[in-house]
Curated annotation (Swiss-Prot):
Stretches of the chain found on the membrane's Vesicular side: 39-52, 108-125, 181-199
Gene name as annotated: CYB561
Ranges in the topological domain labelled Cytoplasmic: 1-17, 74-86, 147-159, 221-252
Cofactor binding annotation: Binds 2 heme b groups non-covalently.
GO aspect biological process, one term: ascorbate homeostasis
Cysteines engaged in disulfide bonds, as pairs: none
Protein name, UniProt field: Transmembrane ascorbate-dependent reductase CYB561
Intracellular or extracellular location(s): Cytoplasmic vesicle, Secretory vesicle, Chromaffin granule membrane
Catalytic activity: monodehydro-L-ascorbate radical(out) + L-ascorbate(in) = monodehydro-L-ascorbate radical(in) + L-ascorbate(out)
Lineage top rank: taxon: Eukaryota
Chain positions with Phosphoserine modification: 248, 250
Cofactor: heme b
Topology class, membrane: Multi-pass membrane protein
Effect of residue 92 to Q: No effect on heme b binding. Decreased oxidoreductase activity
């Protein structure tokens, strides 16, 4: 009798790309904190610094944690599918909660200062991204974690789930870049063109954000780095294929 199949080995370069993405993500979070601390006075909830909670939370939630959530199926290649699903979903929950705190912070700050809401391109994109993120999580939970969805429905929806997950992540990064530029223009005005230290730091932060997104997207699009099907997943896939071809799965 044959022994159990040995777990598939991760492609050689994958761990290095994942490690590089995490290094970039941590640097982005640290640089965001440094920018807010050095040039915007830091963060606080009950003061004029409440606005600064917004960019930090959005970078942590909708950029760093969302990117990590997308990598779960690449990093945990041989763990049980249920475990990876739960981790994938939980990371999105953490990202959503942190982003929600950031969203509340900016609306509270605007209310206290009497500023207008939702007039800029950044704010429109932000609301769109937040709504899409929440909808994606709800639909994903219904199909992949809630026990009522059939295997056939999951199989049909999976490509859309993967595509919109990556698209929402890229939109999140683009929205963060818009917000970064908007914050610089409001604060620095014409001094932005004079290579002010804050502007240079924020520009480097923007480049690192774009690089982080590029590395995440590259990892996701490498077909040979996809999570291999486990034995039980292969059996379900074969049974579904047999059913769709008009036969019944073998009962032997």
């Amino acid at each position: 009798m044959e022994g159990p199949a040995s777990p598939a080995r991760a492609p050689g370069a994958l761990p290095y790309y994942v490690a590089f993405s995490q290094l970039l993500g941590l640097i982005v979070v640290a640089m965001t904190g440094a920018w807010l601390g050095m040039y915007r006075g830091g963060i606080a909830w009950e003061s004029a610094l409440q606005f600064n909670v917004h960019p930090l939370c959005m970078i942590i939630g909708l950029v760093f944690l969302q990117g990590d959530a997308l990598l779960v199926y690449r990093v945990f290649r041989n763990e049980a599918k249920r475990t990876t699903k739960v981790l994938h979903g939980l990371l999105h929950v953490f990202a959503f909660v942190i982003a929600l705190v950031g969203l509340v912070a900016v609306f509270e700050h605007h209310r206290k200062k009497g500023y207008a809401d939702l007039y800029s391109l950044h704010s429109w994109c932000g609301i769109l991204v937040f709504a899409l993120f929440f909808a994606q999580w709800l639909v994903g939970f219904s199909f992949f974690l809630f026990p009522g969805a059939s295997f056939s429905l999951r199989s049909r929806y999976r490509p859309q789930h993967v595509f919109f997950g990556a698209a929402i992540f890229l939109l999140s990064v683009a929205t963060a870049l818009l917000g970064l530029k908007e914050a610089l223009l409001f604060e620095l005005g014409t001094k932005y063109s004079m290579f002010e230290p804050e502007g240079v730091l924020a520009n480097v932060l923007g480049l690192l954000l774009a690089t982080f997104a590029t590395v995440i997207l590259y990892i996701l699009t490498r077909a040979d780095w996809k999570r291999p099907l486990q034995a039980e997943e292969q059996a379900l896939s074969m049974d579904f294929k047999t059913l769709t071809e008009g036969d019944s799965p073998s009962s032997q």
